[in-house]
């Protein structure tokens, strides 16, 4: 059996979507090693349908193909300002922090480490994102959720941990627009802040 992994790191959402503080990578690595010992092979940086086709797999002797496409694409709200620098999906944020060293300002793709961070949503991914932002130095981090706290899909334990870490909760609210501004300096004429 061969697993074709699209990313450069094996483990899927367990590695790129769940922060280390909630699921340590070494635990995921133990599971991956167990699969290897059972004979499972892993090929990284391989997108079935792009890097390798179904016909290629069939020609290579694969008798069956199971498509496990992983976490779905994020849902965007389609409101003005979604494309501003610093506004991103939790999927992108967590992937960049977890796999691309984006918490390091010297990395090739650093994330803005805002002092004030708002995460829109009430699920486990939102809790992971807001708690990650706190760990990256956000002095004020808040969850903005359109329903009540009791209606949040996040596990109660995740909400509890977020509160213990100082996360604020603004429920029964939903953004209708993200507002940004341009800061002009003599060095960079069009840096969005």
List where the protein language model places each region:
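Conserved acidic residues
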Residues: 63, 85, 115
